[in-house]
Regions:
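Beta-strand/loop-alpha-helix module characteristic of Rossmann-like adenine-cofactor folds
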Residues: 1-140
Length: 140
């Protein structure tokens, strides 16, 4: 089926510019907008990331590089793909603003084992400062 790579391209471009990325997980992973909608779970997000990773790796040679922005996006994607998806650091944020809120600092590989909550988001970390590292230790 069709797989969008734009979320992973944004993560790559942000990391290339040393920016963290907040990714809100879909409330309707089916995309149908009807029936019983179940929020995307952490393990679903990992499966989607793997599909995007593989498609981006296959399609990167075809990406346009006519403008500076397009060239930067390709360079950022190449840098991201030269690493390992499973070892990428990520923070799972679940049910923020409720009594059940939870933060878990983990990796993409370990994200599969996380239950998450009713509403989940992910923070993909770029380079972290000493203060940020100390904060992340609370959620490991």
């Amino acid at each position: 089926g069709w797989v969008a790579t734009s979320p992973l391209e944004v993560i790559a471009a942000n990391m290339h510019q040393n920016l963290h990325t907040l990714a809100l997980l879909d409330l309707d992973p089916t995309g149908e907008g009807i029936g019983h909608q179940i929020p995307l779970r952490p393990q679903d997000a990992v499966a989607s990331l793997r599909l995007m990773w593989d498609k981006l790796a296959d399609a990167i040679e075809e990406m346009p590089q006519e403008t500076a922005l397009q060239s930067m996006r390709v360079e950022a994607c190449e840098a991201l793909l030269s690493g390992d998806l499973d070892s990428m650091d990520v923070v799972l944020c679940s049910d923020m603003g409720t009594d059940d809120e939870s933060l878990v600092a983990t990796t993409v590989a370990q994200l599969e084992g996380q239950l998450g909550g009713r509403l989940n988001s992910l923070v993909f970390q770029s380079k972290t400062s000493e203060v940020e590292e100390k904060a992340l230790l609370r959620w490991r």
